[in-house]
Amino acid sequence: MDNMNHEELNDQLLVRREKLHNLREQGIDPFGKRFERTNSTTDLVSLYGEFSKEELEEKEITVSIAGRIMTKRGKGKAGFAHIQDLHGQVQIYVRKDTVGDEEYELFTTADLGDLVGIEGKVFKTNVGELSVKATGFTLLTKSLRPLPDKYHGLKDVEQRYRQRYLDLITSMESRETFVTRSKIIREMRRYLDDNGYLEVETPMMHAIAGGASARPFTTHHNALDMELYMRIAIELHLKRLIVGGLEKVYEIGRVFRNEGVSTRHNPEFTMIELYEAYADYNDIMKLTENMVAHIAKKVLGTTTIQYGDYEINLEPEWTRLHMVDAIKQHSGADFWNPMSVEEARELAKEHNVEIKDTMEVGHIINEFFEQKVEDKLIQPTFIYGHPVEISPLAKKNDEDPRFTDRFELFIVAREHANAFTELNDPIDQKERFEAQLKEREQGNDEAHMMDDDYIEALEYGMPPTGGLGIGIDRLVMLLTNAPSIRDVLLFPAMRHKQD
């Protein structure tokens, strides 16, 4: 369809509708019934690919396969086609004297994109291609629209995202990406289950938007007549479960943030959050690197991966670097000595770091990191020791309370995980929330809201706890070498299509 004008498309649609009418006139259902398959395309290759032409002729192996016609050629009394299923393609050979007049006519009038069922015998052609010689040809579904660009794939990236079903039909690479995504999540679950974690489900609609600094989507509950927020994080409900005695919990689920769309951001995305009682952020660092390495080994067979121009080594142990040391290393600015906000602003001016007038020292430190360091972190690196001002839910560091026991994981200059030793002091937590409310009053609409119910839960006593959040979409991007988050989301957010 990329290279097809409207007139050509309309002609093809009319021809296919006419074929649909003819099928019904012949008593053939163009949207057929159940078809029992014995094999997939990959089964055929793995089971019979090693046999010679002569061995296959001798064995007379009968199979039943189904899929979409992707190529078709031949005239007269015989023809070839390639049939595609989830796993790949296989060639079929159809002869009139084998399948009979009616079924051969079905084959000759079939279009690219039609879904068919084939019964037949496995053989190899003279050039050695594994194929199926049809003894039966069944039309399962008539395709009323032509496939794009003669099955070579969608050239228009926007169309790939809008019509993912066409992308999946025409791009084996795209299908493999989403199969790999499923395997990544399965291995993540398996790793945590094997390590004693309990998978739970918590609400997606919250009375208070909490657990992260982000703008929420709002909705209205008619029966209760109350405003609700689509969750921006899973965190606070999971920590309530830690209070309740569920000592190791995780949830994989959708999170919603009313923010921009980019190659790294989608308004709804998938996260895993996990919490472990009696652990701290050092334990969570070890868990993170071991889990990601495990997933890479199980799904890809290696911990050395290619992402763009970079070869990334995921084998533990990963680099650990304090945020202040990272800033000093990459910019020369030194924030170890306590300083006033005026001194921090002057330092920002000297180093051409853009800041806002309302920022405190901790915010300025974070701006230094984001503007001077982040894009240089290619190999897996744990950046720890975030300022308390930007970490309202993390525990203060015992040795230097300006900073917190928090880390973020960076790979290929992107944040992939956020974790900390959880703040379990309800008095300190209330003070942090109050400081966040002041930020909201100054115009920071991403600052945390007050959550009295969560503070009440902490007052019953939450054990020392380590917590982790990983963006699954970004992890899938990394492990599939995908340049955009849209490449790993089946149906990414899109603007309304212009007529």
UniProtKB/Swiss-Prot annotation:
Subcellular localization, as worded in the UniProt entry: Cytoplasm
GO molecular function, one term: transferase activity
GO biological process: lysyl-tRNA aminoacylation
Enzyme Commission code: 6.1.1.6
Reactions catalysed, as given in the entry: tRNA(Lys) + L-lysine + ATP = L-lysyl-tRNA(Lys) + AMP + diphosphate
Entry GO terms, CC: cytosol
Cross-referenced CDD domains: LysRS_core, LysRS_N
Binding site for Mg(2+) 1: E408, E415
SUPFAM superfamilies per UniProt: Class II aaRS and biotin synthetases (SSF55681), Nucleic acid-binding proteins (SSF50249)
Subunit structure: Homodimer.
Family membership: Belongs to the class-II aminoacyl-tRNA synthetase family.
NCBIfam families in UniProt: lysS_bact (TIGR00499), PRK00484.1 (NF001756)
Listed HAMAP family: Lys_tRNA_synth_class2 (MF_00252)
Protein's recorded name: Lysine--tRNA ligase
Source organism of the structure: Bacillus cereus (strain G9842)
Name of the gene encoding the protein in the UniProt record: lysS
